[in-house]
């Protein structure tokens, strides 16, 4: 479980504390006759929280955690000649809660759900991680649209504005071919694409692609090629593809950005309507875009920072956006204010954090005001899980560590997944060099975590923290690892997807801890304790091999 929190819209890299992002559907590219009519922007209204994550009123969800349930859903889809919409999420994850608070309760989405078979896969249901492997999904949330025959059509962007999400969903439902085929034609025969084809590419969830459509290393260059090939009469769709390319660029080898591209970006930022339509890109990836499009301390960077600052302040004040979206705009302002700060080095036991540049007093005051307001005003449980975790991250990022801790502690009793907030408290303590406090919160977060896959993920984080911050506490490390083996033994999908990565991370961490045989006896005991986990009757031969190699070789998940 990664304790770095970035934008909530980055579902594929989701870990601790994430903030929400939103986007409006961009202007059409290509043949205008193909484009559905756009709805006017409306404020996102949270739904009342329910006790079961998959009982949102009005949507006829089919719960699925095994192949037979998935097969039954596709059989029903074939009989009704409807596509299949698969939602993959978890109770604790902030963007999942944001989707529940602002999308699944909307009447337009509920009505649209009558046109597909909605399948709900809770990552903590027994066997769900095998389903994740079947569909090649990992990050929460991931939403995928399939044909009735089981062919993947597109992956939907969970970070976009709910109104536009429903429009993008409609694009997918009306698509005559999968996005992979559309991409191939776009690169080989761009003139053959219609408006909806270009929009399908622009709004495809590349963050959760899992290399199903394109290799991750080729993504930035491919997105740039798409932006260049997009028809000239659709600048906003082309701009969205270009923003995605800049956001995905390798920071060590950024693409060459010409004067015209920077000018187009500045023009976008200066246009209130057009910039709102790109909200998710501008708020989630502000720092990445600025770094990719300008050199440090250059006049071009100064211009971009000024344009971004104006646009982000405008988005923060836009009450037609959800609280999570506006909070993300404020997070982006802090990110840009710290864009030239040195990267945070991994914390060493007892080490004090590096000094950070002081933020403008007005920005600090705004951070305090907006986070306090969110805490006062939010009553919806889903929205609180999404926004308060983001607010706590924002406070820490702004240098207000004590405020961040106070907010998290005050919300432990209000959260349906307090262990998530505890992990943020642990991360805060680790960053300020308080190893004892960090370990206390990591341990409590693990103890309070719920759900088989979640417990393996949180347990993996606790063990990593022990190895990093208390490497000589052999008994605690051995006890925690032994407990994780015991819990994994009862899970049929322990070596798949997120669970498999969690166990693999533990194996890698313990092998590093034992470098040079420093903890040979403890490792031998842990290897013995692994036997019941590896030898469970339900394990395949590849799973057994993966299990047996956890402490002796490169740890890999079985699939």
Task: For every predicted segment, state its role.
Residues 138-179:
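Non-catalytic, surface beta->alpha helical segment in thiol-disulfide oxidoreductase systems
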Residues 337, 395, 429, 466-467, ...:
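Residue at a conserved register position within TPR or TPR-like alpha-solenoid repeats
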Residues 29-33:
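Bacterial signal peptide processing site
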Residues 88-104:
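Conserved redox-active cysteine motifs that mediate thiol-disulfide chemistry
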Residues 61-67, 88-89, 106-128, 140:
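Thiol-based oxidoreductase modules, predominantly thioredoxin-like and allied folds used
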Residues 188-192, 224-232, 266-277, 312-323, ...:
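Solenoid-like repeat scaffolds
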Residues 193-199, 233-243, 274-288, 319-351, ...:
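Generic helix N-cap/helix-start motif at coil->alpha-helix transitions
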């Amino acid at each position: 479980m990664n304790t770095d929190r970035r934008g909530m819209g980055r579902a594929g890299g989701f870990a601790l504390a994430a903030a929400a992002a939103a986007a409006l559907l961009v202007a059409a590219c290509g043949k205008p006759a193909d484009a559905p009519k756009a709805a006017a922007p409306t404020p996102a209204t949270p739904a009342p929280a329910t006790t079961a994550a998959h009982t949102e009123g009005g949507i006829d969800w089919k719960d699925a955690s095994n192949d037979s349930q998935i097969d039954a859903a596709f059989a029903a889809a074939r009989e009704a000649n409807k596509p299949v919409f698969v939602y993959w999420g978890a109770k604790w994850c902030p963007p999942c809660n944001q989707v529940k608070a602002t999308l699944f309760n909307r009447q337009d989405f509920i009505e649209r759900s009558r046109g597909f078979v909605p399948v709900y896969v809770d990552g903590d249901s027994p066997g769900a991680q095998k389903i994740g492997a079947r569909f090649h999904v990992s990050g929460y949330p991931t939403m995928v649209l399939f044909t009735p025959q089981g062919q993947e059509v597109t992956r939907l962007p969970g970070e976009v504005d709910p109104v536009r999400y429903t429009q993008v969903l409609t694009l997918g439902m009306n698509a005559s071919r999968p996005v992979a085929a559309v991409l191939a034609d776009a690169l080989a025969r761009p003139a053959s694409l219609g408006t909806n084809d270009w929009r399908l590419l622009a709004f495809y969830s590349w963050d959760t692609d899992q290399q199903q459509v394109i290799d991750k290393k080729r993504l930035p260059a491919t997105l740039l090629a798409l932006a260049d090939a997009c028809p000239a009469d659709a600048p906003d769709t082309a701009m969205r593809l270009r923003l995605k390319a800049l956001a995905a660029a390798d920071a060590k080898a950024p693409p060459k950005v010409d004067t015209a591209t920077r000018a187009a970006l500045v023009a976008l930022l200066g246009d209130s309507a057009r910039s709102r339509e790109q909200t998710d890109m501008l708020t989630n990836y502000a720092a990445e875009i600025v770094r990719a499009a300008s050199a440090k301390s250059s006049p071009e960077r100064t211009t971009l920072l000024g344009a971004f600052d104006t646009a982000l302040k405008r988005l923060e004040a836009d009450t037609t956006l959800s609280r999570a979206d506006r909070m993300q705009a404020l997070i982006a302002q802090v990110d840009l204010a710290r864009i030239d700060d040195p990267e945070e080095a991994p914390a060493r036991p007892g080490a004090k954090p590096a000094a950070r540049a002081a933020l403008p007093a007005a920005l600090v005051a705004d951070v305090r005001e907006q986070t306090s307001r969110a805490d006062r005003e939010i009553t919806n449980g889903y929205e609180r899980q999404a926004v308060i975790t983001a607010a706590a991250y924002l406070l820490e990022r702004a240098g207000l560590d004590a405020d961040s801790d106070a907010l998290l502690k005050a919300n432990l009793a209000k959260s349906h997944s307090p262990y998530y907030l505890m992990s943020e408290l642990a991360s805060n303590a680790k960053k300020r060099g308080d190893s004892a406090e960090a370990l206390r919160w990591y341990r409590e977060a693990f103890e309070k975590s719920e759900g088989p896959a979640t417990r393996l993920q949180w347990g993996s984080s606790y063990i990593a923290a022990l190895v990093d911050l208390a490497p000589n506490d052999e008994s605690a490390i051995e006890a925690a690892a032994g407990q994780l083996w015991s819990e994994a033994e009862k899970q049929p999908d322990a070596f798949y997807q997120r669970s498999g990565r969690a166990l693999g991370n533990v194996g890698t961490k313990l092998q590093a801890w034992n470098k040079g045989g420093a903890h040979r006896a403890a490792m031998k005991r842990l290897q013995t304790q692994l036997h019941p986990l590896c030898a469970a009757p339900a394990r395949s031969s590849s799973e057994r091999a993966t299990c047996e190699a956890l402490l002796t070789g490169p740890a890999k998940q079985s699939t």
